[in-house]
Structures are given as C-alpha cells and as structure tokens.
C-alpha cells in the first residue's frame, strides 16, 4: 500500500475546469440535491423535447432506474449533427492502423456522411427501432460508424469483442435474438489476420440450431482475404453504402429507450446483457469524459481500449464525440512492431490525453525504459488508467518514465454496469496516491459494507456498494430483470453491490482491493469462473473443474484451473492433455480466457454437503497453503494434501 502523496501539479491547476474548491462544492450539491444538480448538467446534451422529470429511481423491490424519462433526444445527433455548424471540418476520429504506416483522419462532416449511409443501409434491409444489431468488428472506423448508425435509427447495438470465439459470439446473438450482424472479412492484430467472417459464419450456424436466424450479414472489406459467401444473406459494406443517400434523419428517442446491450461475465453461468439507455448514459459519459480528463477543446484524446468493451463505448465513441473532441482509434497492439508503439503514436498524432490499462503498462515496464525514452511524448498532458487497480510500482513508472513527472494520473474505477467513471481523481483538484482511485465523481455515493450488511464508517475495509443512482447506471439485464435484482441489489438491501472489495483511508480515499465474488479480472477484462469451468467440463476427458485467480505479474490475475478427469482419461500424457484443454477453452470462449495453470487432481476439496471450498483452492493457487483457515467442514482432508503436493505455482 503506497502512502506517498503527489500534490496537484501547478501546471494542472492553472487551466483546470475543476479545482478542489469546485469539486467539494459540486459534490456536496450533487448528493444533497441530485434532482437540481442533474437537471442542470442534463442540459449539456441537446434535447428535441426537454425533460421535466430528472430522477426516478428505487433500489428496493422491483428496482426501477429512470433518468430524464420524459425527455426526447438522439445520441447520434448529439455526437455528430450538433457539431457540424461550428466544427464540421474538425477531425472527429484519427484512425491508426495495425501497420504503423497506415492511418486516416475523419472529420465531423465525413463522420456524418458515413454514419448516415450506414444507417440508410440498415433501414434498407429492414432494421427498425428496437431491433438488435450485433457488431463483430476490429478496431476500424466502421465500428464507430456502425454504433452511431444504430443509435441514429433507434436500433440497439450489441458489440462483441473481435477476440471472442464463434461460440461466444453465437451465445450473444441468441440471447438478444439479433438477426442482423455487421462484421469484416478479417481483422488484423500484430500483423496477423483474424478470421472474423469465418467466425461469424460458424456462429450463425450455432445460433440457427438454437432457433435464432440471422437474416443479413454486412461485411466490411478490411484485408481483401478470401471469405465464403451466403447468397441472399451476405452484403458487402462498400457496395451497399454506395447505393444510399448520405443523409438520414435521426430517430427521436425517449431518454429511457435502449441504446446498447453489452455482455459481461458474471459469477454464475452465461454472460449477462448489460442494458444501457439513451439520455442518462450520454449525459454521464460526456460529463465524465470532460471533467475526469479535464478535456479542453482542440486536444487530441486517445483511449487505447477496444470498442468491444465498455471503455471503448464510453471513452472512444460516445463521451468524446458528444463533447466534439478528436478521439484516436487504434487497431494495433502495444508491442507491434515493438514495445515502443504507444509512444510513437503519441508523438505522431500529438496526443495530449492518454488512457490505458495497467496490464499494458506492466508489460511495457518489463520491456525496459528505452522503448519509452526514445520518443519525446512532449505533447502529453494527462495520463489515465482503467480496467483494474494499478499497482503502485506501475503507477510510479507511468508517472516518472512515461509522464516525465509532469502529467497527473487519473486512476479510474468503474464497471460495464456503471456506464462511466465512478471513483477517480480530477487532475486539477485531487492530490494523488499511487494505487488509489481517490474520490467519488459527482453524484456517486460509495458505501463500505461488511459481510453482515453493516455500513462501515471512517477508515474501513469492506464490500463496495453505491447507495444511490447516477444517470449512467445500467437499467436491467436484457430479458432478465430478476437476474439484475439478484446480482446487484439482493446482497445488500437498497444498495448497488459492485462485487469489489475496497478500503477507505484516513483521507477518505478509496483503494479497490479486487473482486470479492467468483469473477476474475484478467488484463482488465472480467471473466466469470463459472464460464471457464463450463468450457473445461464440456471437454470429454473432464469430469469436474474449479477455476480461481492467482497473482500474475503482467495480467494482474492469472487463470488457475483444477481439473478432475473422467475414469480412464488419466492414461493420457498430462502435458498433451493440458495443451488440448487450453485450446478447448480458447475455442469455447476466446484467447482472453487462456488458462495459465492446469492442475490435474483426483478430487476437489468439498464440504460434507458437496460445496467446493474455493477459499482453499485460492490459497493453494497463491502458494499460501500454510494458512488455510478453518477446514473442519472438509469431507476429505487427503484431497487437500494431494493438491498442495502437486501445485503448479510453487515459488
């Protein structure tokens, strides 16, 4: 735990939008008079019909969350049309390809035409307001066009990360009954092609077996690679957009009409479709983008996330574009052609604000400082971190080496469910402590609760809950409101439970300590242990599996799998079987879920009632088996001795 304090930099204080006095004043107003505060800030976006109701939320009973519910607007209009008069020729998106010699600049006027054309293609093929459109694209401008085109006509987009497998894609198509998919022939990552169209074809076949029929597939030509073609179903994007008008009227949308579904891992079963709506989400995404990054007009802003994750939704596309910013989209990876790529892009495009994940920073830190110091990075003014808690060592490296001690770091905590940043420093207002997300954003009321539900005051450790709503909050789990209530509002009554543990220090700063449920945070991305376990058990050699996390020097958490084999399967070569299981999990979920350690075991530690004692598995995976705690309920102590003897993570 770092106790170092970095006071607000004089340079950051000079031109800041929010100083400490303003922060304290606004925060007080936001929690004592949320209606008044959010009415004022709700007007930061344009409304076709202004709202008269601001907040209508209840975390008890059936849980209702409504913001600006009688207002009418359109997200695409707010991200594009309203900027055309004053900044039509300003660059909206800088696209930096995987290949360092390929890039593209798209102005707001060009963005308008591209989005309108894609919107008209969707309409031409029968997509209507409320229909779900699945987007399975690499990090190319067409991914942003597709999202904004859906928003323009009132279709609900479900973006699936292009690194997910056909099986994972199919599950998401089936869950939201999507009949229109937008994909590319291939993606390119680190110089290697990714077979997106082939994956899409496989996913559509899987979905059809579950009675969800995809009627149309719009295919962007990215590489020109060979693809199979479904006559009457598959459409080339470049041919389709050439045949439609570059103008499309934005659909008037109620503030509570759905904007998008984004699937995220839970502690049980299949991923859940997080549903975000229109008005409150855009108010919150744009407001957090402006104040957390202290964004000033004319600055170049780069968030390195993928649009397949919520960070890409809120802080590559919707937040920056609603603010008329220039946002950079990066197709590549941090280590191609080498580990200096990020900093070369910063110099090439004169990036002022840079937002990335601790896992990338740890990997780059390990590669050595010379990859950083050979670039100038002189345009950088602000650094950000997202996806998982940043360890103080990586924070210090980021501050000293990347930022040359002249850039504040905003270490932001939030989740897919939150729509935008909840706990964060503000660069001109907050003294920084390496490893701490510091203080809540306006309107956010964090509460620490012990396992019995008692609220902890002052300096404390506990489960992180939020006691009142904010405009960017998810409204439900798509098609399963009961699961929404059970997951987030049943553990601690009347509060949203984040699933994270947290410590509050003597200065009121918050330190996120990691998940307290069965969800792993791998390289800043959430994966449910249940998801990985069911992938393992679907292999014919596996009888039972349990998955836990363990500390990993680069990824934050690694994936440790305990596997019990079917009778007879143990005759196989264990190393070969390990490789086979790794490939099997990658096929079922995607490379992001690649197991780091697989331990074969004759049995798993269970209570007499048959419950797996995960606490013990975690301790063994962490090589901390000396303090297993109370094992009196164990049905068979011998199982634990075997696990300790054969552990895969011996230090």
UniProtKB/Swiss-Prot annotation:
Positions bound to ATP: 387-389, 411-416, 500, 515, 526
Cofactor section: Mg(2+)
Gene Ontology biological-process entries: acetyl-CoA biosynthetic process from acetate
Ranges in a coiled coil: none
Keyword hit for ATP-binding: yes
Residues involved in Mg(2+) binding: 537, 539, 542
The protein's enzyme class: ligase
Keyword terms of this UniProt record: Acetylation, ATP-binding, Ligase, Magnesium, Metal-binding, Nucleotide-binding
Posttranslational modification: Acetylated. Deacetylation by the SIR2-homolog deacetylase activates the enzyme.
Modified residues (N6-acetyllysine): 611
Pfam annotation, one family: AMP-binding
Family annotation (SUPFAM superfamilies): Acetyl-CoA synthetase-like
Keyword Coiled coil part of the UniProt annotation: no
Listed Gene3D superfamilies: 3.30.300.30, N-terminal domain of ligase-like (3.40.50.12780)
Residues bound to CoA: 189-192, 311, 335, 523, 586
EC number assigned by the record: 6.2.1.1
Domain of life: Bacteria
Reaction(s) catalysed (UniProt annotation): acetate + ATP + CoA = acetyl-CoA + AMP + diphosphate
Family: Belongs to the ATP-dependent AMP-binding enzyme family.
UniProt name for this protein: Acetyl-coenzyme A synthetase
UniProt organism field: Brucella melitensis biotype 2 (strain ATCC 23457)
């Amino acid at each position: 735990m770092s106790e170092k304090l970095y006071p607000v930099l004089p340079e950051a204080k000079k031109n800041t939008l929010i100083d400490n006095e303003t922060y304290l004043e606004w925060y007080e107003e936001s929690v004592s008079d949320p209606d008044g505060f959010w009415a004022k800030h709700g007007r930061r976006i344009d409304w076709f019909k202004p709202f008269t109701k601001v907040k209508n939320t209840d975390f008890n009973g059936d849980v209702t969350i409504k913001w600006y519910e009688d207002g009418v607007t359109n997200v695409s209009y707010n991200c594009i049309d309203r900027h055309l008069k004053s900044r039509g020729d300003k660059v909206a998106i800088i696209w930096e390809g995987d290949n360092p010699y390929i890039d593209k600049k798209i102005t707001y006027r060009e963005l308008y035409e591209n989005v309108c054309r894609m919107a008209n293609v969707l309409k031409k093929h029968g997509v209507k307001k409320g229909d779900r459109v699945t987007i399975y694209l690499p990090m190319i401008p067409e991914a942003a066009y597709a999202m904004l085109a859906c928003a323009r006509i009132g279709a609900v987009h479900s973006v699936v990360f292009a690194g997910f497998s056909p099986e994972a894609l199919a599950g998401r198509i089936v869950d939201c009954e999507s009949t229109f998919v937008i994909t590319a022939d291939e993606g390119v990552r680190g110089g290697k092609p990714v077979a997106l169209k082939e994956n899409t074809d496989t996913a559509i076949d899987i979905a059809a077996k579950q009675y969800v029929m995809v009627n149309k597939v719009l295919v962007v030509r990215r590489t020109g690679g060979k693809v199979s073609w479904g006559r009457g179903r598959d459409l080339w994007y470049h041919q389709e957009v050439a045949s439609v008008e570059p103008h499309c009227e934005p659909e008037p949308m109620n503030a509570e009409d759905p904007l998008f579904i984004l699937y995220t891992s839970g502690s049980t079963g299949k991923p859940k479709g997080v549903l975000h709506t229109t008005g409150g989400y855009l108010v919150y995404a744009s407001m957090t983008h402006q104040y957390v990054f202290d964004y000033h007009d004319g600055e170049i802003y780069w968030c390195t996330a993928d649009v397949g994750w919520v960070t890409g939704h809120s802080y590559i596309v919707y937040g920056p574009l609603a603010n008329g910013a220039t946002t950079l989209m990066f197709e590549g990876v941090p280590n191609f052609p080498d580990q200096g790529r990020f900093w070369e892009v910063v110099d090439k495009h004169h990036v002022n604000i840079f937002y990335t994940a601790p896992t990338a920073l740890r990997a780059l830190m390990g590669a050595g400082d010379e990859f950083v110091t050979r670039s100038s990075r002189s345009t950088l003014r602000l650094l950000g971190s997202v996806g998982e808690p940043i360890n103080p060592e990586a924070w210090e490296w980021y501050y000293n080496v990347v930022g040359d001690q002249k850039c504040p770091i905003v270490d932001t905590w939030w989740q897919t469910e939150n729509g935008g940043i909840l706990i964060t420093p503000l660069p001109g207002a907050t003294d920084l402590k390496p490893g701490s997300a510091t203080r809540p954003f306006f309107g956010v009321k964090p509460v620490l609760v012990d396992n019995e539900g008692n609220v902890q005051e002052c300096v404390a450790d506990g489960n992180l809950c939020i006691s009142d709503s904010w405009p960017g909050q998810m409204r439900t789990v798509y098609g399963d409101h009961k699961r929404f209530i059970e997951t987030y509002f049943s553990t601690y009554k009347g509060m949203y439970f984040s699933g994270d543990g947290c410590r509050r220090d003597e200065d009121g700063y918050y330190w996120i300590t990691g998940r307290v449920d069965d969800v792993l945070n791998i390289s800043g991305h959430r994966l449910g242990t249940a998801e990985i376990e069911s992938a393992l058990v679907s292999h014919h050699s596996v009888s039972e599996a349990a998955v836990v996390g363990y500390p990993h020097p680069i990824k934050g958490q690694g994936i440790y799998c305990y596997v019990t084999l079917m009778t007879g399967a143990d005759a196989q070569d264990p190393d070969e079987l390990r490789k086979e299981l790794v490939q099997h999990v990658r096929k079922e979920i995607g490379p992001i879920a690649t197991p780091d350690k697989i331990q074969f075991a004759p049995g798993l530690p269970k209570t007499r009632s048959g419950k797996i004692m995960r606490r013990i598995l975690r301790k063994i995976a962490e090589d901390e088996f000396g303090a297993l705690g109370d094992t009196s309920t164990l049905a068979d102590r011998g199982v634990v001795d075997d696990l300790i003897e054969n552990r895969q993570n011996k230090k």
